[in-house]
Amino acid sequence: MRSGVIAQKVGMTRVFTETGEHIPVTVLKLGNCQVVGHRTTEKNGYVALQLGSGSRKTVYMPKAERGQFAVAKVEPKRKVAEFRVSEDSLIPVGAEILADHFVVGQFVDVTGTTVGKGFAGGMKRWNFGGLRATHGVSISHRSIGSTGGRQDPGKTWKNKKMPGHMGVDRVTTLNLRVVQTDVERGLILVEGAVPGSKGGWISVRDAVKKPLPKEAPKPGKFKVAGEQAAEAPAVQEGA
């Protein structure tokens, strides 16, 4: 099981195949995604990689966090996340994971925080049908109707779909296809929509419900500080 990466959502665009078909894609950018720590079975009870991405001013950072990045010899990161991996998929601390960690054509699972919509009614939040437009209905056309129950059970059950805050939920979208990668600019283009707003942090990992391509690098594609990574084409077409 390989590590995922931390990326930022840039926005959506489209790419064209050789046959003229256009594919809507979401552009994800790797902002110097580095390994900042290991989690081992002996010390932590599980095996994982701790990754960091982006940059952060140390003046606003707790002393304990500054020490953690100092030990790893990496610059302070704005976003930190853990990815469970197998023993043979550990990547050295300080290594930077590159965009061609994923290969064109493979499927990935992406996780992000959805756009906040504020307080929403039942029709917008849960796709309720609402009440009738006429025939005695006044003012309550968009209400949810009955919340269920009479004297027995005499209450509204927990988790009943009702109006309330909508959005800002942690959502995972499965099986998005990698269309292109740009190693020089650190870009990954995936087919379809990705949850979250522009600039939001996205976790990208190998799809759990699809087989991993044989050409996918193991334990991953990365470069260690002071070393040159293997040369790769700037853009790989996935027609």
Curated annotation (Swiss-Prot):
Give the UniProt entry's GO cellular component terms: cytosolic large ribosomal subunit
User: One MF term from GO for this chain?
Assistant: rRNA binding
Instruction: List the Pfam families hit by this protein, alphabetically.
Output: Ribosomal_L3
Give yes or no: UniProt keyword DNA-binding: no
Question: Which Gene3D superfamilies does the UniProt entry name for this protein?
Answer: 3.30.160.810, Translation factors
HAMAP family in UniProt: Ribosomal_uL3_B (MF_01325_B)
Name this polypeptide is given:
Large ribosomal subunit protein uL3
